[in-house]
């Protein structure tokens, strides 16, 4: 992807989340970009994230999809409210389906879209694709937190 600044870098440059925080030196650094009504990302696996040789660990897959879908929700909640900055959102519920082994020899691609939206929550469906095949899908509910919640100021 050629986009210069991801949602994470633009709106939460000091975020230390292991999955998507730009400020976490040991993190996965998921970089999500709005595109044609969806949010997309490309991520290159490293061997240290393998479950076994050549196959990405399922927990890492879950983290990638969770963070990417969370940012999809935050972005769309921001647009829905006509705000300049996304609300801090957290995962309220989340389901992932691992459909096939995810190879680590090339980039994986994430895509997510909102399927239901209210003022403070979004239901998001996402996919992780590798080698031209969908390897995992997810569906989650992500909620904008209110002041007083531990995650309120994380962005």
Residue spans of the language-model regions?
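Hydrophobic beta-strand-centered segment that forms part of the acyl-chain substrate-binding groove
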Residues: 70-109
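Short histidine-centered beta-strand/loop micro-motifs
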Residues: 52-55, 106
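Active-site helix/loop of acyl-thioester processing domains in fatty-acid/polyketide metabolism
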Residues: 36-38, 56-84
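Conserved beta-strand residues within beta-sheet cores
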Residues: 26-29, 42, 91-95, 109-111, ...
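Non-catalytic linker/capping segments at the edges of enzyme domains
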Residues: 1-51
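HotDog/MaoC-like acyl-thioester-processing domains
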Residues: 1-8, 102-109, 113-155
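Hydrophobic residues in beta-strands and at strand termini
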Residues: 43-45, 98, 144
């Amino acid at each position: 992807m050629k986009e210069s600044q991801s949602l994470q870098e633009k709106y939460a440059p000091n975020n230390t989340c292991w999955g998507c925080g730009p400020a976490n030196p040991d993190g996965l650094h998921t970089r999500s970009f709005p595109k044609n009504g969806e949010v997309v990302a490309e991520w290159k696996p490293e061997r240290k994230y393998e479950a076994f040789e050549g196959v990405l660990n399922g927990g890492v897959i879950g983290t990638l999809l969770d963070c990417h879908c969370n940012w999809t929700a935050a972005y769309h909640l921001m647009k829905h409210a006509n705000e300049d900055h996304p609300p801090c959102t957290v995962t309220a519920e989340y389901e992932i389906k691992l459909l096939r082994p995810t190879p680590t020899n090339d980039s994986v691609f994430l895509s997510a879209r909102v399927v239901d939206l209210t003022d403070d929550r979004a239901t998001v469906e996402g996919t992780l694709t590798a080698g031209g095949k969908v390897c995992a899908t997810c569906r989650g509910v992500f909620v904008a937190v209110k002041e007083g919640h531990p995650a309120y100021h994380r962005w």
